[in-house]
């Protein structure tokens, strides 16, 4: 199969004319993008970078749009204390070259208890950021009902008076990573060392991202782990339980709508489908709509 990237030797020389390539290897686990790691030696030492090119994915904007957004963010986020990789180069239309972050994808010993606190702290740190922090223009994501009416028209009949309503967002939209799950986290020495894959970032309701992270903990560990994350978050920042209830319905519904296009192994797909069906049904009951 043809490589989605330029010649590895040419790439590292484009970054530093003194570079000598040591290693070029694809990185496993990327569902929404092609990725490879390059290690090279230059006059100032050894460097490691990652190349990324987004793939076309159901339910996501086009690859060029996602790559452009991620490139703009990654010139800013490391300076704001967020453990995101720094952009080395953006090569239009859709190729990013990023600093390689050291860390492990597997959670530390003692999970899920060992991951709840670090995840909550990172979420709260993200959600304190907004346009006033010099972020690039981003799409907004504040209303769960628009998509839900499309996905579940049976729950939103046109003649219903009044129809189901979600309380308005109380504050300004904040920075959301847009795909906050364990697969995008790196761990080192028991702590969070990196948050990867910023192509879906937006300004929106923090409760949407909290609900998404809760889905992942539910499917990976248990419903109790998902609830523990909400309590850990609430110890650091306000939790709007009324809006969280709607996002707790939205997120599993979105996953059930799109997961067949994710390319997951059959066993993983079955596990996530079972957990998200359970979570969707529980959230519907909590909203009084089940």
Give residue ranges: language-model regions.
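Active-site activation/catalytic loop segments of kinase-like enzymes and analogous catalytic loops
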Residues: 207-238, 251-267
């Amino acid at each position: 199969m043809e490589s989605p990237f330029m010649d590895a030797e040419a790439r590292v020389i484009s970054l530093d004319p003194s570079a000598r390539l040591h290693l070029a290897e694809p990185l496993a686990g990327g569902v929404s993008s092609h990725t490879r790691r390059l290690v090279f030696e230059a006059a100032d030492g050894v460097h490691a970078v990652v190349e990324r090119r987004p793939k076309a994915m159901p339910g996501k904007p086009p690859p060029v749009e996602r790559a452009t957004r991620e490139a703009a963010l990654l010139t800013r986020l490391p300076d704001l204390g967020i453990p995101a990789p720094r952009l080395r180069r953006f090569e239009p239309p859709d190729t990013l070259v990023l600093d390689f972050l050291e860390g492990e994808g597997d959670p530390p010993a003692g999970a899920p208890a060992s991951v709840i606190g670090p995840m909550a702290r990172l979420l709260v740190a993200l959600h304190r950021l907004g346009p006033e922090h010099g972020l690039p223009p981003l799409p907004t994501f504040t209303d769960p009902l628009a998509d839900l009416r499309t996905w579940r028209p049976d729950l939103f009949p046109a003649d219903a008076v009044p129809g189901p309503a979600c309380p308005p967002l109380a504050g300004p939209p904040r920075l959301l990573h847009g795909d906050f799950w364990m697969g995008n986290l790196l761990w080192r020495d028991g702590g969070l060392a990196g948050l990867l894959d910023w192509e879906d970032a937006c300004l929106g309701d923090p409760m949407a991202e909290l609900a998404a992270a809760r889905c992942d903990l539910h499917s990976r560990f248990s419903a109790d782990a998902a609830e523990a994350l909400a309590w850990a978050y609430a110890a650091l920042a306000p939790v709007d339980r009324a809006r969280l209830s709607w996002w707790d319905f939205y997120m599993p519904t979105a996953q059930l709508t799109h997961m067949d296009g994710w390319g997951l192994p059959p066993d993983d797909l079955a596990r996530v489908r079972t957990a998200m069906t359970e979570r969707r049904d529980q959230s519907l009951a909590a909203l009084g709509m089940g």
